[in-house]
Amino acid sequence: MTDYKATLNLPDTAFPMKAGLPQREPQTLQRWDSIGLYQKLREIGKDRPKFVLHDGPPYANGTIHIGHAVNKILKDMILRSKTLAGFDAPYVPGWDCHGLPIEHKVEVTHGKNLSADRTRELCRAYAAEQIEGQKSEFIRLGVLGDWSNPYLTMNFANEAGEIRALAEMVKGGFVFKGLKPVNWCFDCGSALAEAEVEYQDKKSSTIDVAFPIADEAKLAAAFGLPSLGKPASIVIWTTTPWTIPANQALNVHPEFEYSLVDVGDKLLVLASELVESCLARYKLEGTVVATTTGQALELINFRHPFYDRLSPIYLAEYVELSAGTGIVHCSPAYGVDDFTICKQYGLSNDDIISPVQSNGVYVESLEFFGGQFIFKANQNIIDKLVEVGSLMDTETISHSYMHCWRHKSPLIYRATAQWFVGMDKQPESGETLRKRAVKAIEDTEFVPAWGQARLHSMIANRPDWCISRQRNWGVPIPFFLHKESGDLHPRTVELMEEVALRVEKEGIEAWFKLDASELLGDEAAKYDKISDTLDVWFDSGTTHWHVLRGSHPMGHETGPRADLYLEGSDQHRGWFHSSLLTGCMLDDHAPYRELLTHGFVVDENGRKMSKSLNNVVAPQKVNDSLGADIMRLWVSATDYSGEMAVSDQILQRSADAYRRIRNTARFLLSNLSGFNPATDILPAEEMLALDRWAVDRTLLLQRELQEHYGEYRFWNVYSKIHNFCVQELGGFYLDIIKDRQYTTAADSTARRSCQTALFHISEALVRWIAPILAFTADELWQFLPGERNESVMLNTWYEGLTELPADFEMDRAYWERIMAVKTSVNKEMENLRAAKAIGGNLQAEVTLYAEDSLVADLSKLSNELRFVLITSTASVAPFVSAPADAVVTEVAGLKLKVVKSGHAKCARCWHHREDVGVNPEHPEICGRCIDNISGAGEVRHYA
């Protein structure tokens, strides 16, 4: 038998079938670095419109986890797609460097007896070390960025910029000193931001406490009685027994009805709706003597259960009837509502009783409980209430309670002297911060859209922002306070600039080593230099002001503005939140035009990642086992608007999808062997109809993908690219062209037409996948024929695709109908192969029985219909002539019949043809193959 292999155009490419991503990706990173890819992108983007994504800085502590990887990959996909869309899309990565976690790490390693200066020195060194580790892990994900020049909140320039931002806020009238209850962690020894609070279940003792009446006549009058006749008490219910020593008032709702209840030996005041449940709890029987409104009880004095002081009734609308007694005990030092109500009733800061120290221990001078830790004192307080006869009931409940996100320990509200940004404080000019922020939210685009309502609710209801902390490792609040009046120095803003200039040169250490006389001269003796530092959310929240300024051509009249902030959904209460507030104070608008949030990563069962559950997916391990491109593909395929499920099995499915895309790319490359686009490319009008359709279909898909990329809908991008590779290419077009590619003359119009289409498709596809499969796209780029620059990223979306003319006979709808017919034929072929009636499609001869309109469509392909159906013979007949055993298809007006060919198989093209062996010189091949080998070659028009 003659070997005709040498006469075929067999596919050939050096592009490897096996990706070997864990080994090849680090080499690609080295190549990007050696060619200066990021710098080249900035050079070619100089005259392009800018797109600025401002990086929310991760905390410089520990190795990266899967959530970090998701965040950085999403950012990279957006910026790569924007680059391909013709924007200059720089990426300046950042790190959040100050704050308690780093200080805590240093204390654990070096002990707690370090000097403040030494602590700062070690914290700075630790943060720098952590940044280097995280940086290499982010780079390994394929994230393009200015990694040599990241912004760090501990860079001297940024520390100085933060001080200048604070000075602007002071100048604008937003900052004030106040005594207010703030979230307080005993382990941190500091106030916490709202974003640093998490809620966990906690067991607490509830107590019902009777406060005896101090003014019997007023209470009797309030209930319309001439006298009480018995001892009377009002009963409160609380879950925090430790706050009873700090009680200073009692709250009732002005509109609720309250009852005076006779329980035998005494009278109790309770909310009318709760009398029955309270008496049941106290195991008492009673009769309602009289009722009144909360309003009538205002300012009536009761006595503290065990201290010699009064507790007046204050009206408060926050009182509820969902639990307890309808009366709330009020400790202004340990509750936000308590504090607010007491201030409304004229209680001064000096009047507020605050016996709990920063470590959670009562001051020694507190009678009965001095020196005790508050949570351990709960039982002693209960015992004291029993002793004085004021305890009505105690129970243990489990309820959601605020905890420190770092130490997981319970928090309290604690009134301390702190620096605040006022949400409703009238600034020097313009609207209040709350009004500005609400308006800014309305002017911002949100992805997903529900983020807008979430952030709006948080801003509408949040308290003033406590910006001060009592720690060493943080940007200082460089204030001088008058020793007698407590007022800020009149030249505070000017002095802050002098401090900023020093910090710019020496870092925050410049403030801490500064002697007040260096700035204040003889005035220094009259002022205290404070040691408070700024909340770390102020650090990251002001980066837009000093990092972004000057980076964007739009919005500079009123300050910088990023096109996009992108972080996890927890940042509505974190970075999005603090950045919004600082932006509205400094520039009167949000520092972003659009906010994108992604969900948290969970396992395939929706559970949080946890070492105890053994379900942690570490990005480092994924890189080493599957490759970063597989992780990137998983990110793209997952709808990030909700929780993002990942597991080894899910990643394996991504790896399978990756192989299908890679195999498609390899098929394209292997069939471009010998193709030189400079000399072999055909104009659209000379291409075969099917090839023109394939290019047109690619153009339509590119438009869809550009839209999806623009809307950050990467899961749509992924699914459409995957379907295009597997179905429209792999399941239709690429199958059909194999015969033409392999069997026609190497430089025939039929083959060059197909190669032209494959070239256009490849040029488009490599760009489509570049934002997602960053490494693979760059590898593919190196194997494409023709002269090209060093990286796919140095280009924009492919512009060589052509659209079918409006009057083209074989238009898009035509090929849709042909595809439907081919699908029906394939289905019947599968049935026959399963029944072993035929071995392969080319053993088949198919007859299509069609209605007139479909006959017209099919007849347009003439004798090339068999190449589209991939059968040795294909004929068309009227629908009415279909025999009884013809198969009814899903295509309206189409039946078909497939029979096994009785003709010999061509040894070259494998078609079963009647003319195999007709030529004695080539007895094993068909006439078409003889013509392609030694004749003028077959002519194709359509497929």
UniProtKB/Swiss-Prot annotation:
Record's catalysed reaction(s): tRNA(Ile) + L-isoleucine + ATP = L-isoleucyl-tRNA(Ile) + AMP + diphosphate
Its required cofactor(s), as named, are: Zn(2+)
GO process terms (BP): isoleucyl-tRNA aminoacylation
- Where Zn(2+) binds, per the record, is at 906, 909, 926, 929
Protein family membership: Belongs to the class-I aminoacyl-tRNA synthetase family. IleS type 1 subfamily.
Report the domain remarks.
IleRS has two distinct active sites: one for aminoacylation and one for editing. The misactivated valine is translocated from the active site to the editing site, which sterically excludes the correctly activated isoleucine. The single editing site contains two valyl binding pockets, one specific for each substrate (Val-AMP or Val-tRNA(Ile)).
Listed binding positions for L-isoleucyl-5'-AMP are 567
**What is known about its subunit structure?**
Monomer.
Note on how the cofactor is bound: Binds 1 zinc ion per subunit.
* Species for this entry: Pseudomonas syringae pv. tomato (strain ATCC BAA-871 / DC3000)
User: What biological function has been recorded for the protein in this entry?
Assistant: Catalyzes the attachment of isoleucine to tRNA(Ile). As IleRS can inadvertently accommodate and process structurally similar amino acids such as valine, to avoid such errors it has two additional distinct tRNA(Ile)-dependent editing activities. One activity is designated as 'pretransfer' editing and involves the hydrolysis of activated Val-AMP. The other activity is designated 'posttransfer' editing and involves deacylation of mischarged Val-tRNA(Ile).
Q: Does the keyword Amino-acid biosynthesis apply?
A: no
Question: What gene, per UniProt, encodes this protein?
Answer: ileS
Query: Please, which domain of life does this record's source organism belong to?
Result: Bacteria
Spell out the InterPro entries in the cross-references. Answer: aa-tRNA-synth_I_CS, aa-tRNA-synth_Ia, Anticodon_Ile_BEm, Ile-tRNA-ligase, Ile-tRNA-ligase_type1, Ile-tRNA_ligase, M/V/L/I-tRNA-synth_anticd-bd, Rossmann-like_a/b/a_fold
Motif 'KMSKS' region extends across 608-612
Keyword Ligase appears in the UniProt entry: yes
Question: Coordinates of motif 'HIGH' region in the sequence?
Answer: 58-68
Q: Might you give the EC number(s) for this enzyme?
A: 6.1.1.5
User: Where do the TM regions start and end?
Assistant: none
What does the entry list under GO cellular component? cytosol
Residues annotated to bind ATP:
611
- Its protein name is Isoleucine--tRNA ligase
Q: Which UniProt keywords apply?
A: Aminoacyl-tRNA synthetase, ATP-binding, Cytoplasm, Ligase, Metal-binding, Nucleotide-binding, Protein biosynthesis, Zinc
Q: Which GO terms describe its molecular function?
A: aminoacyl-tRNA deacylase activity; ATP binding; isoleucine-tRNA ligase activity; tRNA binding; zinc ion binding
What is the annotated localization of this protein? Cytoplasm
